[in-house]
């Protein structure tokens, strides 16, 4: 029974995206402790400043999976590219308890859960990209199998204005946490537009 409860807690932990976005919002504009190292100060809003802000926020998020991320940025053009390692379907539980406490086989849902998780994570990475520097106007997010240099699963492009008026609202009102997207990740992707 403890294993079933643990699986259910895990599934619930994969639906806290609005809380993660709130954390990103609180971190936005915070001082960057890595901008000065050994007395050398990086340019505010420069490559080093933006990249260290991005990675600091990513590393401080409390996600159910460790996520390796790489980022490239060109502050002069406002472009950012992010690649992250998406979890594998085998990392999701094979069974969760139903309303009667009996284990329900969910092996067939793992691929959908993985896709929905990766899409939500891609949107959160874009949110972080826009939060670390107001000069970032476009974020391309690439989900890869397992590691940032793994096989490409998908790539999404976000621009600041559209993100603010569509995807950011999904975080703000909690819609992105809705379990309906777990059974139909394509519906979540459509909600980003």
Annotate the PLM regions.
Residues 1-193:
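Long, charge-dense low-complexity segments
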